[in-house]
Each structure stands twice: as structure tokens, then as C-alpha cells.
Regions:
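Active-site segments of SGNH/GDSL-like serine hydrolases
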Residues: 43-49, 69-103
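Catalytic His-Asp segment of secreted/periplasmic serine-dependent ester chemistry enzymes
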Residues: 86-162
């Protein structure tokens, strides 16, 4: 706007004339007057909250009026804006946000009202970014300063500032449109999702809805399966695993439904295409192209110029209005011209509903005589501009000469909405179109930030990468360090969780929420031999506890089917419920059709570990009482079906397999064998399940006799075994693996995510795990590398964990060969198996938090596996078991200050941090010991200072 801007701030000064450092007595204040401003923004009051200054609060309004009088007396007659101070807290400086909110801000508002001066609410503007965009709890960093500047600009000019990419650890950004789907940016509200490619001439936006599932409920129960069980077990007892496996292939498999497609698959919703026209600028070369995803707001942008026109596109999925929004605008009136259409590769039709409204509708193949899942996606357009022309035919909507346009899309399926899915989608769209869409975007940001801003991490920024796009940073990361890329990855993981699931919806599947085809890899289902569990590893520690609830609901729905599968496959004596290695929205619990991978029967036990984990963080006894019957039912299955193996008399699962892995029997036969009894992972899961059920029964004061029976059974389980070469054994016998670098490392479940093995409690087993991991190697699929990050973090080896993280971020393809995908990470930070699988992202997110904070062994462990290159950093809002929240600042690899906010468990302890000589708890020295016990009430904050 061609204004000269002057900043006449002086740090630590007060508005109060009686304060310790009065601003109006400084030379900077006189310089501000001499500047003869046309516009003045006054932001004072933060330092007036200090005790020595707040005692003079009776004169605060008088001093503010005096300051205003001095500016109004100037010959320039400036417009004056009063700013509300930003959120600030710093105990040792005496700065108190409670006084700012309840004392200083009301005074400023009173003066503004008395003098009819406008107020700029910087406190509200910065509150979502406190403390993550602050240097020290009082002073904002450069990104916080940018938000203040944007807020001032908007309030003074009445215009939205031109958006630009933000923080390097909260922004994915690119300087060209996406060339393939794995370069597009994911958005979602927990049910609806979209992925725009940012195309300039033709733009492709893939639409998603979490319940777009083909298939239907079906009977997979094989009535003859349990008849073969005694013979299968006899063969296993005699070491004839090959014969047992062959028998299972013919008998211990699910019954095939009459029509084979009932299992179904998660599918895309559809495609939205925009064909943009640029009029006289059609031949102008696009310039200043940027597209990015702002994790701090949950919004994506595309910006570029053509000729003298600057174009801005904004993409957001609103949770409150339950719609997808695309906002197109330009700085020159009448510059928005496009044609929009909807389509789907199969089983989709398009029709005009009304002027400015198109519907994509259809049904997904049930594979049976049951009703298909039906869906409706309805797009509506509203425009602004005096010369706007808008027309709708049966296939498209055309907009010409608009100043700005909003595309609003709603979608519903009969799976979640029932028979009213179509009318409900139309109602939601109409309600959204009637609303103030700018306010809808603001509401969407606040709704998202209510979750996202609970926690975050900061790691050292490298100025050398500030100008690099995200894909360039990924490539550079293999040769040169970039710690803030790990912070970006962690923040992105939390973003993906918030975007892909919410209470009342479905849990994220193998694709999370996002798919670009009707036939997703592995059906886009819920693999229960690690994948759906890995999806949820970071949820609790990332302070997103309620995002567990869709998984809890899924498990509840599986129980009746699991009870039927238990009796059909394991005999009438089988109690409780069972789940094998995969499931879907149709409650599939039977074994897989190939026993080599489908015989694993501990999927339910592993999911119960997550049910228990949610209790450990929440402490909700009503929740525990609700899920206890599920956990008990899972334990009853194993208690009633496990058998004594003949060699040691141990209780084992049989038949089963170690997930997807195989071995060779002794001798010359090189037939890969998967079917076995009592693999290490099964025993770890059963031991954990029994232990958790016992603990839950004690808490709930129920089933004492059954708990005692489980305790006795625990004593009959096989112990962990170490091979002659020092590895943790994967099977009861020290078999030779068919692939020593196999992607699954299932027998280390007890190290992570379980807690039966640790460096402190079981050092010999921990060392065996270390040797096992070295033998397995650091390569593997994307999600396998992610799991190994967690293993090494649990072993306390931060540098090795970080090495695995860098391996996880290996570029999935090169510019020279973009269609050949390998393991690693795509340009949009999606994990590549290959192909894309979302579990690797959340496994990596979990691994980063495990490097910074652990609590699985009954104590808080700060920086348990800190890499050398993360010497300085901070995190806030991370949760530990017991419900406490931890904020931490560290320098030179050692913690400096930790603030702990109490949860449901009051008595906690912390491991004495490595390299620390003295610890102060609320200014009182702690006794030097291996652990620091302390008490903190729920909601109470205590501070540790480390020296």
C-alpha cells in the first residue's frame, strides 16, 4: 500500500508511568511522535502484568489515555488502533497471561469503547499458536510475527493478505502442480477427504469418503474346519509342520460365499475436474507458482500469477459444516473462469439437480444379493461479481467473469447415513451454501486447531533448506541433515490422524482416508497383524485420545462375528471371540484364504492391547467397564483353545503362524513353512492380554476366580528364548528363516509396542533384540522401516533410530523414473510400501515421539533416544500413561525445563535424566537417585529445572 512502516518498540517496557521501565519516558517514544504517523497501532500491556507493575493498575487507563492524547495531538491526525496483548506466560519474569486476560485486556477495551477506537485482537489471533510459535513463552518467533503482521494488515486494510507458505516444520510446499496422485495434498475432516493437484489449466481433485466400501456381510464359516483341528495339532506335535500346513490348505480355510466379491474394498468417491480459462492472459506464462499445505490451519493453497492477475485457490474440509470447500479468487475483478464436472471411473452417474448443482451418484457392488452401498456427492457453486455468468447442464457447471467463486461439495453413503443419504447430502450442501463461507473456513480452522494445537515439537531449523520445496528437502535429506524435517513429519502425522478419523466415523484403513481408484491395494482394509495397530500407535502420546474411539467401535462390532468364527474353526468348546489377520467394515473375522498368512489368530488380542492402552492414558473407569467384556472374551478364546505342546508342556496357540513369515524345517527340504504352534509373538500377545484382563478385573472388582486362573495360565506360557547365536527366537524351535531380512519383525512385539522387554528390566532380552535387528537389517518396506525406528528408540539408540528415519524418507522415485516406485516416501510425505500405505506415516510419527518421551515401563523417561543432531529442541503437550501432559525444552542434548500437567494418576516418577547433576522441582532440589518420585494433581502444573 506504499506506506512507510516504523516499529518503535522497546522490549520489557510498560505502559504504566509508574512501572519499572515506562515506555513514554524512552527516546523511542519521542521518535514515534516525530515520525508523524498516519496510522498508529499500540500494543502495550504485557510487561504491566508483572507484580511490580500491576500494583499500579489504578492508573493504567489514565496512562493509556495520555498515550492516545499525545498521538492525537500530532499534525498528522493519525488513525489509532488499540491492540490486545498476545498470550504470554513466563513465571521467572513475572509475566502472567491470567492478568493480561482478566485485567489488562478489559482496561484496553474500556478505553477503546470510551474513545470509539478500533480494537485489534492479537490475543485471540495468537492463542491457537501459543506456545509453539514463541521463542520463550513471551516473544513470538518469525512465524508468530508473521501472523501478527497478517492480522494487523487485515484489520487496517479490510483485505485478506496474499497467502504464502509458512513454517518449514508446519508446511508442505511445492513450486509446480502435482504430476501424479502421490504428489497431491491430502485434506479431510475425519469422514470426507480431497486431494487437489493444483493444476493451472486443468485441475484434478480426487474426492474421498471413509465409508465408500463395496462388499457386504457374508457367511465365511467353514463347518468342517474344526473337524480337522485335532489332526493338524497332532502333526504339529510330531514336528510334521509341512503336512499340517498342507492339511490346513484344504480344510482350515474360510467358506467361499456363493458370489466371490463380498469381502469388498475401500474405494475413491470420485473425481472433480476444473478446466480454467484465462481470457487475454491465456498465452501468458504462469509465474510465482506455489502450492502448499498449512498444517497449522489444515488448509491447502495454490497461488500463481498470469499477466497482471494474481490467482489464489484455497482448499479446506469443514468438520462443522461437513463439506469440502474450494475457494477461487483473484486480485483483478472478473478473472475467475472455469468449467467444473464430476466423474467416477466406474459405477457412477452425473446429473443436474438444479442451477449451480451437480450430483455424482451410484452404488458399489455388494458381491451378493444384499443391497449395495449407495452414495451421493453433490457439488454446488456460488459466485461474486457484477459480470458473472453461470450456467449448468447435465454434466458440468460453467462460471465466467466472476470476481470469486466457491465450490462446495457434500457427500453421504447409505453405510453411515442409511436410506436418507441422498436427501441428507443435499440438505448439508444447501445449509452450507446459505452460510457465510468465509466464516465457515474460519470455523473449520478453529475446529481443527482445537485438536492440532494440543501438542507439537520443534527441532533445529536449517536456513539452507528454507528455500527448498518439500520434495527437494526429501532428496537432500539423504546426504545432508535436516532435523526440522523430522518435526514436519511428526506434525504431519498428527495432521493426518485428525483429518482421517473422528468419533462417530470409521478408523483409518490402509489408505487412511485417501484413495484414487476403485480397487485399492490390499482392498484398503484393516490388516490386523500390524497395520491397523500401527495406524494408532501415536494417537495417545500425540494428545489425540478421542481419535481412538472409532477403533474401539470397530472392535465392538467384530465380537459377535468373532464368536461365531471361534466355534466354527476351533470347535464347540471354544469360548469368547477370535480375529485373524484382517478385517473390513463387514466384520470379517475368519482366517485368510491362504494359511501361510491367514492362520495368524491373535488379531483380536492385539486390538485388545489398544483398548487397554486407551484406558492407561485416559483412566476412564466407565470406559474400562465397557470394554472389559471384550478383553475378557478375547482371553477366553485363548484360555479355551490353547494346548500343551509335548516337549515342555507349555501352553501354546496351534495352529497359527508368525505373521507372513516362513521358515525351513531341519533337513534338506526347502519348502517354506508358515504353519506352526506358539510363535513368540502369539505368546507375547497372550501374556499381555491375560495380564491386562487380570489388572482390569482388579480395578473393576470382578471375576476374581477367572483372574486367578489366568495368572496360573501365564505361568505355563513359553518363556522368551534366545538362540545359540544370540538372537531372540521367533518360533518355539530355532528354525532357519526363509528370509533373514523379512519385513515383519513380529517376535519383537514385546519390545515395541509391548513392554515385556526393556533395557532396564530385561537387559539380556534387549541385547538379543539388538542382535536380531542388526541381522534383519535396516531395509524393508516403508512401514517396516517405521517399526524399526520404534524398536531402536526403545533400545535407547537415538542415532540408529534416526538413521532408520532417514531410510524411511528415502525418495520413493526419482525425477528420471517417476513411475517406478520403491520403499520410502513420496513427495507429499506419504509412505511408500510400495505402493502407498498410511501405516508407515503413523509408525514414523510414533517413532519420533518414542525418541523424545517414553512411559511404558512405569516411569517418565525424558529424551530416552535423542539423536546427536537434535541437540536443541522442545516439545509441548505430549502425553504419558497416567494421563499427564509433558512440555520440555532441551539444549546441548540435556533437558533444561519440563512442565508436567497432572492427569488421572497422581503419583508418578521420572527417570533421572542422563547428564543432569541437579534437579529442582518447583524450586526445591530433588534427592539424587535413579528415579524422582513426585505427586501432581489432575490439572495441576509443576515445573522441573535441570542443571
Amino acid at each position: 500500500n506504499n506506506y512507510e512502516v516504523g516499529n518503535f518498540d522497546v522490549t520489557a517496557h510498560t505502559l504504566s508511568q509508574k512501572g519499572d521501565l515506562p515506555y513514554m519516558k524512552t527516546t523511542r517514544f519521542q521518535e514515534a511522535l516525530d515520525f508523524l504517523p498516519n496510522i498508529v497501532t499500540i500494543k502495550l500491556g504485557t510487561n504491566d502484568s508483572k507484580p511490580q507493575n500491576w500494583q499500579h493498575r489504578a492508573t493504567f487507563k489514565d496512562d493509556l489515555n495520555l498515550l492516545i492524547d499525545k498521538f492525537q495531538a500530532l499534525a498528522s491526525h493519525p488513525h489509532i488502533y488499540l491492540c490486545l496483548p498476545i498470550p504470554s506466560n513466563r513465571k521467572e519474569w513475572g509475566i502472567n497471561d491470567s492478568i493480561i486476560v482478566n485485567g489488562i485486556i478489559p482496561y484496553i477495551r474500556e478505553v477503546a469503547a470510551e474513545r470509539s477506537l478500533p480494537v485489534i485482537d492479537l490475543h485471540t489471533a495468537m492463542l491457537p499458536y501459543y506456545p509453539q510459535l514463541y521463542v520463550d513463552g513471551v516473544h513470538p518467533d518469525k512465524y508468530g510475527a508473521a501472523i501478527i503482521a497478517e492480522t494487523l494488515y487485515k484489520c487496517i486494510t479490510g483485505e485478506e493478505p496474499h497467502p504464502t507458505p509458512g513454517r518449514s516444520d508446519q508446511t508442505l510446499w511445492y513450486d509446480e502442480p502435482a504430476a501424479q496422485w502421490e504428489e497431491t495434498l491430502p485434506l479431510g475432516n475425519g469422514r470426507l477427504g480431497m486431494m487437489p493437484d493444483g493444476g493451472i489449466g486443468k485441475e484434478h481433485i480426487v474426492l474421498n469418503e471413509i465409508s465408500m466400501w463395496s462388499g457386504s456381510e457374508a457367511n465365511y464359516l467353514n463347518p468342517d474346519a474344526s473337524k480337522s483341528l485335532p489332526e493338524i495339532r497332532r502333526l504339529l506335535f510330531e514336528g510334521k509342520n509341512k503336512e499340517a500346513q498342507e492339511l490346513m490348505y484344504t480344510s482350515f480355510v474360510p467358506k467361499k460365499p456363493e458370489k466371490g466379491g463380498t469381502y469388498g474394498a475401500f474405494q475413491m468417491l470420485g473425481d472433480l475436474f476444473l478446466e480454467h480459462q484465462y481470457g487475454v492472459h491465456e498465452k501468458d506464462v504462469p509465474a510465482d507458482y506455489h502450492r502448499w499445505l498449512d498444517l497449522s490451519k489444515g488448509i491447502a493453497y495454490t497461488t500463481f500469477s498470469r499477466g497482471n492477475v494474481n490467482y489464489v485457490r484455497e482448499y479446506v474440509v469443514s468438520r462443522d459444516k461437513d463439506v469440502m470447500l474450494i475457494h477461487l479468487k483473484a486480485n483483478v475483478p472478473g478473472s475467475i473462469n472455469f468449467k467444473m464436472n464430476l466423474s467416477r471411473p466406474e459405477r457412477g452417474s452425473v446429473r443436474k439437480l438444479a442451477e449451480g448443482k451437480l450430483e455424482l451418484y451410484g452404488s458399489l457392488d455388494s458381491g451378493s444379493s444384499q443391497t449395495d452401498v449407495r452414495y451421493a456427492a453433490i457439488a454446488g457453486i456460488t459466485c461474486k461479481g457484477r459480470q458473472t455468468n453461470q450456467s449448468t447442464d447435465e454434466q458440468s457447471i460453467t462460471v465466467q467473469n466472476a470476481d470469486e467463486a466457491w465450490i462446495v461439495v457434500s457427500a453421504k453413503t447409505s453405510f453411515l447415513a442409511g436410506e436418507i443419504y441422498e436427501t441428507e447430502a443435499d440438505r448439508i450442501l444447501n445449509d452450507a451454501l446459505k452460510s457465510n463461507l468465509c466464516e465457515t473456513v474460519s470455523e473449520a480452522i478453529l475446529s481443527y486447531q482445537a485438536l492440532f494445537n494440543r501438542a507439537g515439537i520443534r527441532l533445529p531449523e536449517n536456513e539452507a533448506v528454507s528455500h527448498l520445496t518439500t520434495d527437494q528437502r526429501i532428496e537432500r535429506f539423504q546426504q545432508q541433515d535436516d532435523p526440522s524435517l523430522a518435526a514436519l513429519y511428526y506434525n504431519y502425522g498428527r495432521y493426518l490422524l485428525i483429518s482421517s478419523t473422528r468419533p462417530g466415523s470409521l478408523p483409518p484403513n490402509l489408505q487412511g482416508l485417501w484413495a484414487n481408484e476403485p480397487g485399492t491395494p490390499w482392498n484398503g482394509d484393516y490388516h490386523t497383524n500390524i497395520n491397523v495397530q500401527m495406524n494408532h500407535w501415536p494417537v495417545e502420546q500425540a494428545n489425540l485420545s478421542e481419535l481412538y474411539l472409532p477403533l474401539v467401535d470397530l472392535v465392538k462390532r467384530l465380537v459377535p462375528s468373532g464368536e461365531e468364527s471361534a466355534k466354527a474353526f476351533y470347535g464347540p468348546q471354544a469360548k469368547g471371540w477370535v480375529l485373524h489377520m484382517m478385517t473390513n467394515v463387514w466384520n470379517y473375522t475368519a482366517p485368510g484364504e491362504h494359511p501361510s498368512w491367514g492362520a495368524t489368530n491373535t488379531g483380536g488380542a492385539w486390538l485388545c492391547a489398544h483398548l487397554w492402552e486407551h484406558y492407561l492414558f485416559s483412566g476412564d473407569r466407565n470406559y474400562l467397564a465397557d470394554i472389559y467384556p471384550i478383553m475378557k472374551g478375547a482371553s477366553e478364546f485363548f484360555y479355551s483353545t490353547m494346548v500343551r505342546e509335548p516337549k515342555h508342556g507349555w501352553l501354546v496357540t496351534a495352529p497359527t503362524s508368525s505373521p507372513e513369515n516362513a521358515f525351513y524345517l531341519p533337513g534338506k527340504d526347502r519348502t517354506p513353512i508358515s504353519v506352526c504352534m506358539g510363535p513368540t509373538m502369539d505368546i507375547q500377545l497372550v501374556r499381555e492380554l491375560y495380564t491386562n484382563v487380570i489388572e482390569a478385573s482388579h480395578i473393576l472388582h470382578t471375576d476374581t476366580a477367572y483372574a486367578e486362573a489366568l495368572q496360573e495360565a501365564i505361568g505355563l506360557l513359553p518363556p522368551h528364548q534366545i538362540s545359540k547365536k544370540g538372537y531372540l527366537m521367533e518360533w518355539l524351535e530355532d528354525y532357519e528363516e526363509t528370509d533373514i531380512h523379512h519385513r515383519h519383525v513380529s517376535h519383537l512385539y514385546g519390545l515395541h509396542p509391548g513392554n515385556q522387554i526393556s533395557v532396564l528390566k530385561t537387559p539380556e532380552l534387549a541385547e538379543a533384540c539388538r542382535k536380531t535387528l542388526n541381522r534383519r537389517g535396516d531395509e524393508g518396506t516403508g512401514w517396516s522401516r517405521a517399526w524399526k525406528i520404534n524398536f531402536w528408540a526403545r533400545l535407547g539408540d537415538g542415532n540408529r533410530a534416526y538413521k532408520l528415519f532417514r531410510s524411511l524418507l528415502y525418495p520413493a522415485y526419482t525425477a528420471q523414473n517417476p513411475t517406478q516406485h520403491g520403499s520410502g516416501t513420496f513427495p507429499n510425505l506419504f509412505c511408500s510400501h510400495p505402493p502407498f500405505q498410511m501405516d508407515g506415516n503413523w509408525g514414523g510419527t510414533s517413532g519420533i515421539s518414542e525418541m523424545l518421551l517414553q512411559s511404558q515401563d512405569g516411569f517418565i523417561h525424558l529424551l530416552p533416544a535423542l539423536p546427536e543432531s537434535w541437540k536443541d529442541g522442545s516439545f509441548y503437550g505430549l502425553k504419558v500413561r497416567g494421563g499427564a501432559t509433558v512440555d520440555l525444552v532441551w539444549k546441548d542434548g540435556k533437558p533444561v525445563q519440563a512442565t508436567i500437567t497432572g492427569g488421572w494418576q497422581n503419583n508418578l516418577k521420572m527417570k533421572w535424566p542422563k547428564g543432569v547433576k541437579k534437579v529442582l522441582l518447583n524450586d526445591t532440589a530433588c534427592r539424587t537417585d535413579s528415579f524422582i518420585p513426585f505427586t501432581v494433581k489432575q490439572g495441576e502444573c509443576i515445573t522441573f529445572i535441570f542443571e
